Amino acid sequence: PCIAQSVDPAIGFFVNLLSIGFIVISACHEPLYGSAGLYLFAYMFLYGNPVEGRLLVLRALEMLLGLLICGAVFYVNHRKKQYEKRFFQIVKEFSLSTPLGKWQFQVILGLSLGILVGELLQVDRVMWVGCACLTVLTQYGERPNKRAFQRLGGVVAGSLLFGIVYQVLPPAAKSSLGIYSGLLLGLCAAYHWKTLLNCFG
């Protein structure tokens, strides 16, 4: 993400395309496990919180430490298991002719384009554009346009409801609005309700 942000948006698009493509193809070959959302939200978090100089070095060291810890845990728990596929086999099996390959391509291209549009429009927090794209695109086996309409409806309804509730609430209660909406968000299963409650955060 730090490289993509330091260059022209058009070049950044290709940097993001390659980076996101590597993540999705190498680590998201079981979409029902939800790993795409996890890894790509982490990518967008890094994109939305850029650092330079000493802080960038510290971030790299933190990530290396996290990698070593996770690698050690993974090794201890899985060292006796036999895996049918190696890393390069997974990468070689990527194909646009399979449902998995089409879904992976949809996520890679959609997220990269979302970031590019956010950069070209000079959105303050491009991270949120990417996160919105992710919630629409990463659901395996579901048409993205259905979730896009649910998101649009949830945002419109949530924004209107937030405006009304914020005007009615006493000043002392307004600071707790995000906390309570977050708690309610955890109880929601339907995507449109989650989108609506996100407007309160």
Feature map (PLM): residue ranges:
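Alpha-helical transmembrane segments and their membrane-interface boundaries
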Residues: P1-L197
